[in-house]
Amino acid sequence: KKILKQAEDMGYTFLVGPECEFFLFQTDEEGKPTTKTHEMAGYFDVSPIDMAENVRRDIVLNLEEMGFVIDASHHEIAPAQHEIDLQYADALSTADNIMTFKMAVKTIARRHGLHATFMPKPKAGVNGSGMHINMSLADKDNRNVFVDEADPLGLSRVAYQFMAGILNHIKEITVLTNPLVNSYKRLVPGYDAPIYIAWSAASNRSPLIRIPSSRGSNTRIELRCPDSAVNPYLALAACLGAGLDGIRNQMEPPVSVDDNIYTMTEEERRQRGIQWLPETLGEALELYAGSNFVRELLGDHIFYKYFEAKNAEWKKFRAEVTDWE
Protein backbone atom coordinates (compact mmCIF):
# COMPACT_ATOMS: atom_id res chain seq x y z
CA LYS A 1 0.00 0.00 0.00
CA LYS A 2 2.96 2.31 0.66
CA ILE A 3 4.19 1.86 -2.92
CA LEU A 4 0.67 2.26 -4.32
CA LYS A 5 0.45 5.57 -2.43
CA GLN A 6 3.72 6.69 -4.05
CA ALA A 7 2.22 5.91 -7.46
CA GLU A 8 -0.95 7.79 -6.53
CA ASP A 9 1.10 10.81 -5.46
CA MET A 10 2.74 10.75 -8.90
CA GLY A 11 -0.73 10.67 -10.51
CA TYR A 12 -0.79 6.97 -11.41
CA THR A 13 -2.87 3.86 -10.76
CA PHE A 14 -1.01 0.57 -11.19
CA LEU A 15 -2.99 -1.96 -13.25
CA VAL A 16 -2.07 -5.62 -13.46
CA GLY A 17 -3.21 -8.75 -15.29
CA PRO A 18 -1.63 -12.08 -14.24
CA GLU A 19 -1.39 -15.23 -16.36
CA CYS A 20 -1.56 -18.04 -13.79
CA GLU A 21 -0.14 -21.44 -14.74
CA PHE A 22 -0.46 -24.67 -12.76
CA PHE A 23 -0.32 -28.46 -13.07
CA LEU A 24 -3.06 -30.99 -12.33
CA PHE A 25 -1.60 -34.28 -11.13
CA GLN A 26 -3.14 -37.59 -10.14
CA THR A 27 -3.35 -38.65 -6.51
CA ASP A 28 -2.52 -42.12 -5.18
CA GLU A 29 -4.90 -44.57 -3.49
CA GLU A 30 -4.44 -42.70 -0.21
CA GLY A 31 -5.27 -39.36 -1.83
CA LYS A 32 -1.69 -38.10 -1.66
CA PRO A 33 -0.34 -36.08 -4.60
CA THR A 34 1.89 -37.66 -7.24
CA THR A 35 3.56 -36.22 -10.34
CA LYS A 36 1.70 -38.64 -12.62
CA THR A 37 -0.33 -37.00 -15.37
CA HIS A 38 -3.60 -38.32 -16.74
CA GLU A 39 -3.15 -36.92 -20.27
CA MET A 40 -0.48 -35.93 -22.80
CA ALA A 41 -2.13 -32.81 -24.23
CA GLY A 42 -0.18 -29.77 -25.40
CA TYR A 43 -0.62 -26.06 -26.01
CA PHE A 44 -4.27 -25.08 -26.60
CA ASP A 45 -5.33 -28.72 -27.08
CA VAL A 46 -9.02 -29.53 -26.65
CA SER A 47 -11.06 -32.60 -25.73
CA PRO A 48 -10.63 -35.53 -25.90
CA ILE A 49 -6.86 -34.96 -25.71
CA ASP A 50 -7.21 -32.32 -22.99
CA MET A 51 -8.81 -34.63 -20.43
CA ALA A 52 -8.88 -31.94 -17.74
CA GLU A 53 -10.98 -29.55 -19.80
CA ASN A 54 -14.01 -30.23 -17.58
CA VAL A 55 -11.94 -29.58 -14.46
CA ARG A 56 -10.70 -26.29 -15.86
CA ARG A 57 -14.24 -25.33 -16.88
CA ASP A 58 -15.47 -26.12 -13.37
CA ILE A 59 -12.71 -23.93 -11.93
CA VAL A 60 -13.63 -21.04 -14.23
CA LEU A 61 -17.37 -21.31 -13.54
CA ASN A 62 -16.80 -21.36 -9.79
CA LEU A 63 -14.45 -18.37 -10.01
CA GLU A 64 -17.04 -16.45 -12.04
CA GLU A 65 -19.67 -17.22 -9.39
CA MET A 66 -17.23 -15.70 -6.88
CA GLY A 67 -17.08 -12.49 -8.92
CA PHE A 68 -13.90 -13.12 -10.90
CA VAL A 69 -13.71 -12.03 -14.53
CA ILE A 70 -11.67 -14.56 -16.51
CA ASP A 71 -9.93 -13.34 -19.65
CA ALA A 72 -8.79 -16.74 -20.96
CA SER A 73 -8.45 -20.40 -20.03
CA HIS A 74 -6.50 -23.06 -21.93
CA HIS A 75 -4.16 -26.04 -21.79
CA GLU A 76 -0.49 -25.09 -21.64
CA ILE A 77 2.57 -26.66 -23.30
CA ALA A 78 3.41 -29.45 -20.83
CA PRO A 79 1.11 -32.42 -20.20
CA ALA A 80 -1.40 -31.64 -17.41
CA GLN A 81 -0.35 -27.96 -17.38
CA HIS A 82 -3.02 -25.26 -17.53
CA GLU A 83 -3.33 -21.48 -17.66
CA ILE A 84 -6.11 -19.19 -16.47
CA ASP A 85 -5.74 -15.45 -17.05
CA LEU A 86 -7.40 -12.99 -14.70
CA GLN A 87 -8.84 -9.72 -15.98
CA TYR A 88 -6.83 -6.54 -15.62
CA ALA A 89 -7.49 -4.75 -12.33
CA ASP A 90 -5.81 -2.47 -9.83
CA ALA A 91 -2.77 -4.06 -8.19
CA LEU A 92 -4.19 -4.55 -4.69
CA SER A 93 -7.36 -6.23 -5.99
CA THR A 94 -5.22 -8.40 -8.26
CA ALA A 95 -2.98 -9.51 -5.38
CA ASP A 96 -6.07 -10.44 -3.35
CA ASN A 97 -7.50 -12.29 -6.35
CA ILE A 98 -4.31 -14.30 -6.89
CA MET A 99 -4.42 -15.58 -3.31
CA THR A 100 -8.11 -16.51 -3.59
CA PHE A 101 -7.57 -18.01 -7.04
CA LYS A 102 -4.88 -20.42 -5.86
CA MET A 103 -7.00 -21.64 -2.95
CA ALA A 104 -10.03 -22.12 -5.21
CA VAL A 105 -8.06 -24.03 -7.86
CA LYS A 106 -6.65 -26.45 -5.28
CA THR A 107 -10.07 -27.00 -3.68
CA ILE A 108 -11.91 -27.64 -6.95
CA ALA A 109 -9.16 -29.91 -8.29
CA ARG A 110 -9.47 -32.00 -5.11
CA ARG A 111 -13.18 -32.47 -5.81
CA HIS A 112 -12.17 -34.09 -9.10
CA GLY A 113 -9.62 -36.36 -7.43
CA LEU A 114 -6.66 -34.34 -8.69
CA HIS A 115 -3.89 -32.33 -7.04
CA ALA A 116 -3.29 -28.78 -8.29
CA THR A 117 0.19 -27.39 -7.77
CA PHE A 118 1.65 -23.97 -8.45
CA MET A 119 5.19 -25.27 -7.92
CA PRO A 120 7.32 -23.61 -10.63
CA LYS A 121 9.02 -26.81 -11.86
CA PRO A 122 7.39 -29.98 -10.49
CA LYS A 123 8.88 -32.22 -13.22
CA ALA A 124 12.20 -32.18 -15.05
CA GLY A 125 12.24 -32.24 -18.83
CA VAL A 126 9.06 -30.21 -19.37
CA ASN A 127 8.12 -26.53 -19.19
CA GLY A 128 7.64 -25.05 -15.75
CA SER A 129 4.75 -22.90 -14.55
CA GLY A 130 5.10 -19.14 -14.54
CA MET A 131 2.87 -16.22 -13.74
CA HIS A 132 3.56 -13.59 -16.38
CA ILE A 133 2.56 -10.16 -15.11
CA ASN A 134 1.04 -7.67 -17.57
CA MET A 135 1.40 -4.11 -16.29
CA SER A 136 0.43 -0.55 -17.16
CA LEU A 137 -0.22 2.78 -15.46
CA ALA A 138 -3.39 4.86 -15.73
CA ASP A 139 -3.72 8.56 -14.98
CA LYS A 140 -6.43 10.20 -12.87
CA ASP A 141 -8.78 10.16 -15.86
CA ASN A 142 -8.20 6.39 -16.26
CA ARG A 143 -6.21 6.87 -19.47
CA ASN A 144 -3.35 4.49 -20.20
CA VAL A 145 -0.16 6.57 -19.85
CA PHE A 146 1.93 3.94 -21.67
CA VAL A 147 0.36 5.06 -24.98
CA ASP A 148 1.98 7.42 -27.47
CA GLU A 149 0.73 7.01 -31.02
CA ALA A 150 3.58 9.19 -32.33
CA ASP A 151 6.17 6.64 -31.17
CA PRO A 152 7.20 3.95 -33.70
CA LEU A 153 6.17 1.25 -31.21
CA GLY A 154 3.23 3.20 -29.82
CA LEU A 155 4.90 3.52 -26.41
CA SER A 156 5.17 6.66 -24.31
CA ARG A 157 8.29 7.97 -22.63
CA VAL A 158 6.76 6.90 -19.30
CA ALA A 159 6.40 3.34 -20.60
CA TYR A 160 10.07 3.21 -21.62
CA GLN A 161 11.17 4.65 -18.28
CA PHE A 162 8.98 2.24 -16.30
CA MET A 163 10.37 -0.69 -18.26
CA ALA A 164 13.93 0.60 -17.81
CA GLY A 165 13.43 0.72 -14.05
CA ILE A 166 12.37 -2.92 -13.95
CA LEU A 167 15.26 -4.01 -16.18
CA ASN A 168 17.67 -2.03 -14.02
CA HIS A 169 16.49 -3.51 -10.72
CA ILE A 170 15.37 -7.00 -11.78
CA LYS A 171 18.38 -8.85 -10.35
CA GLU A 172 17.77 -7.30 -6.92
CA ILE A 173 14.07 -8.18 -6.90
CA THR A 174 14.25 -11.64 -8.48
CA VAL A 175 14.02 -13.31 -5.07
CA LEU A 176 10.62 -11.60 -4.73
CA THR A 177 9.35 -12.63 -8.18
CA ASN A 178 10.91 -16.11 -7.97
CA PRO A 179 11.00 -17.00 -4.28
CA LEU A 180 11.70 -20.74 -4.09
CA VAL A 181 14.73 -22.98 -4.55
CA ASN A 182 12.60 -24.68 -7.19
CA SER A 183 11.90 -21.38 -9.00
CA TYR A 184 15.40 -21.47 -10.48
CA LYS A 185 14.88 -24.97 -11.93
CA ARG A 186 12.32 -23.26 -14.20
CA LEU A 187 14.65 -20.41 -15.15
CA VAL A 188 16.90 -22.48 -17.42
CA PRO A 189 17.39 -22.44 -21.21
CA GLY A 190 15.21 -24.63 -23.40
CA TYR A 191 11.79 -24.40 -21.79
CA ASP A 192 10.45 -20.99 -22.86
CA ALA A 193 11.39 -19.42 -19.52
CA PRO A 194 12.97 -15.96 -19.72
CA ILE A 195 16.46 -15.81 -18.26
CA TYR A 196 17.98 -12.95 -20.28
CA ILE A 197 17.57 -9.32 -19.21
CA ALA A 198 16.30 -7.71 -22.40
CA TRP A 199 13.05 -6.55 -23.98
CA SER A 200 11.30 -6.83 -27.33
CA ALA A 201 8.15 -5.64 -29.05
CA ALA A 202 8.54 -8.30 -31.75
CA SER A 203 7.04 -11.78 -31.66
CA ASN A 204 9.93 -12.90 -29.48
CA ARG A 205 9.57 -14.77 -26.20
CA SER A 206 13.24 -15.08 -25.29
CA PRO A 207 13.64 -11.68 -23.52
CA LEU A 208 12.56 -10.95 -19.97
CA ILE A 209 10.05 -8.29 -21.01
CA ARG A 210 7.75 -8.58 -23.99
CA ILE A 211 5.53 -5.82 -25.36
CA PRO A 212 2.30 -7.54 -26.50
CA SER A 213 0.97 -6.41 -29.88
CA SER A 214 -2.23 -4.78 -28.53
CA ARG A 215 -2.09 -0.99 -28.50
CA GLY A 216 -4.33 1.88 -27.49
CA SER A 217 -5.93 1.33 -24.09
CA ASN A 218 -4.53 -2.24 -24.03
CA THR A 219 -0.88 -1.13 -24.28
CA ARG A 220 1.14 -2.89 -21.59
CA ILE A 221 4.43 -4.54 -20.76
CA GLU A 222 4.66 -8.22 -19.87
CA LEU A 223 7.23 -9.33 -17.30
CA ARG A 224 7.76 -13.03 -17.93
CA CYS A 225 10.00 -14.27 -15.10
CA PRO A 226 7.60 -14.39 -12.10
CA ASP A 227 6.06 -17.68 -11.03
CA SER A 228 2.88 -18.50 -9.15
CA ALA A 229 4.74 -19.28 -5.91
CA VAL A 230 5.18 -15.54 -5.32
CA ASN A 231 3.78 -13.53 -2.49
CA PRO A 232 1.82 -11.29 -4.91
CA TYR A 233 1.85 -8.30 -2.56
CA LEU A 234 5.65 -8.26 -2.38
CA ALA A 235 6.18 -9.11 -6.04
CA LEU A 236 3.83 -6.40 -7.32
CA ALA A 237 5.27 -3.86 -4.88
CA ALA A 238 8.75 -4.67 -6.19
CA CYS A 239 7.69 -4.33 -9.84
CA LEU A 240 5.88 -1.05 -9.23
CA GLY A 241 8.69 0.34 -7.09
CA ALA A 242 11.27 -0.48 -9.75
CA GLY A 243 9.12 1.03 -12.49
CA LEU A 244 8.49 4.24 -10.55
CA ASP A 245 12.22 4.53 -9.87
CA GLY A 246 12.76 4.38 -13.62
CA ILE A 247 10.27 7.22 -14.12
CA ARG A 248 11.71 9.40 -11.34
CA ASN A 249 15.26 9.01 -12.63
CA GLN A 250 14.25 9.18 -16.31
CA MET A 251 15.99 5.88 -17.06
CA GLU A 252 16.36 4.71 -20.64
CA PRO A 253 16.02 1.03 -21.54
CA PRO A 254 18.70 -0.71 -23.61
CA VAL A 255 18.13 -1.28 -27.32
CA SER A 256 15.41 -3.88 -27.91
CA VAL A 257 16.51 -7.40 -28.82
CA ASP A 258 14.29 -8.87 -31.51
CA ASP A 259 16.48 -11.89 -32.26
CA ASN A 260 16.15 -15.21 -30.46
CA ILE A 261 18.51 -14.84 -27.49
CA TYR A 262 18.39 -18.57 -26.77
CA THR A 263 20.23 -19.31 -30.02
CA MET A 264 22.94 -16.66 -29.53
CA THR A 265 26.42 -17.67 -28.47
CA GLU A 266 27.76 -16.46 -25.16
CA GLU A 267 30.07 -14.12 -27.05
CA GLU A 268 27.16 -12.64 -29.04
CA ARG A 269 25.23 -11.99 -25.84
CA ARG A 270 28.29 -10.40 -24.24
CA GLN A 271 28.86 -8.10 -27.22
CA ARG A 272 25.24 -6.94 -27.05
CA GLY A 273 25.42 -6.39 -23.29
CA ILE A 274 22.75 -8.98 -22.50
CA GLN A 275 22.91 -10.11 -18.88
CA TRP A 276 20.93 -12.87 -17.19
CA LEU A 277 18.88 -13.46 -14.08
CA PRO A 278 20.31 -15.07 -10.92
CA GLU A 279 20.71 -18.81 -11.43
CA THR A 280 19.97 -19.97 -7.87
CA LEU A 281 18.05 -18.80 -4.84
CA GLY A 282 21.39 -18.24 -3.12
CA GLU A 283 22.62 -15.91 -5.85
CA ALA A 284 19.30 -14.04 -5.84
CA LEU A 285 19.53 -13.63 -2.07
CA GLU A 286 23.03 -12.12 -2.30
CA LEU A 287 21.80 -9.52 -4.79
CA TYR A 288 18.73 -8.79 -2.65
CA ALA A 289 20.78 -8.47 0.55
CA GLY A 290 23.10 -5.90 -1.03
CA SER A 291 20.31 -3.72 -2.41
CA ASN A 292 19.62 -0.41 -0.68
CA PHE A 293 16.85 0.11 -3.23
CA VAL A 294 14.91 -2.97 -2.08
CA ARG A 295 15.52 -2.24 1.61
CA GLU A 296 14.05 1.25 1.23
CA LEU A 297 11.22 -0.15 -0.88
CA LEU A 298 10.12 -2.80 1.63
CA GLY A 299 11.25 -1.19 4.87
CA ASP A 300 13.72 -2.74 7.29
CA HIS A 301 11.32 -5.13 9.02
CA ILE A 302 10.03 -6.91 5.91
CA PHE A 303 13.41 -6.69 4.17
CA TYR A 304 15.32 -8.49 6.93
CA LYS A 305 12.57 -10.94 7.90
CA TYR A 306 12.18 -12.03 4.29
CA PHE A 307 15.93 -12.50 3.97
CA GLU A 308 16.07 -14.59 7.15
CA ALA A 309 13.27 -16.89 5.98
CA LYS A 310 14.66 -17.40 2.48
CA ASN A 311 18.24 -17.75 3.66
CA ALA A 312 17.17 -20.50 6.08
CA GLU A 313 15.40 -22.22 3.18
CA TRP A 314 18.52 -21.98 1.01
CA LYS A 315 20.80 -23.32 3.75
CA LYS A 316 18.45 -26.25 4.36
CA PHE A 317 18.42 -27.10 0.66
CA ARG A 318 22.22 -26.94 0.46
CA ALA A 319 22.44 -29.50 3.26
CA GLU A 320 20.20 -31.97 1.41
CA VAL A 321 21.46 -34.78 -0.86
CA THR A 322 19.22 -35.17 -3.92
CA ASP A 323 18.35 -38.33 -5.88
CA TRP A 324 20.24 -36.91 -8.88
CA GLU A 325 23.45 -36.81 -6.83
Regions found by a protein language model. Name each.
Residues 1-325:
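Glycine-rich, acidic/polar active-site loops that bind/position phosphate-bearing ligands
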